[in-house]
Amino acid sequence: MSVTRDDVRHVAQLARLDFSEEEEARMAEELSEILGYVEKLDELDTAGVPPMSHVLDVTNVFRSDEIEERIDRGQALEPAPDADNEHFLVPQVVE
């Protein structure tokens, strides 16, 4: 598949990016090479390869949940610079 500078311009516009003409030309060439490689992958015979969600055989490495003693809300809020009885209070950052 060949990527044109118009294709690059269109995608750049969607992503709100601005490229020079040299950058557009370089990206069109590089993307064409990448898509050419992907097309080569389509030629591979994968009939005997089982579907997988991960390249490596990964198992669950998470620990099991254990109930632990926890601090109460008052202790958690105590070091906060500003809090009410239930919440941390922070300055407004978005108007």
UniProtKB/Swiss-Prot annotation:
Keywords from the named record: ATP-binding, Ligase, Nucleotide-binding, Protein biosynthesis
Catalysed reactions, semicolon-separated: L-glutamyl-tRNA(Gln) + L-glutamine + ATP + H2O = L-glutaminyl-tRNA(Gln) + L-glutamate + ADP + phosphate + H(+); L-aspartyl-tRNA(Asn) + L-glutamine + ATP + H2O = L-asparaginyl-tRNA(Asn) + L-glutamate + ADP + phosphate + 2 H(+)
HAMAP family: GatC (MF_00122)
Gene3D superfamilies membership: Glu-tRNAGln amidotransferase C subunit, N-terminal domain
Organism whose genome encodes this protein: Salinibacter ruber (strain DSM 13855 / M31)
Keyword Chaperone: no
Region (Disordered): 74-95
Protein name: Aspartyl/glutamyl-tRNA(Asn/Gln) amidotransferase subunit C
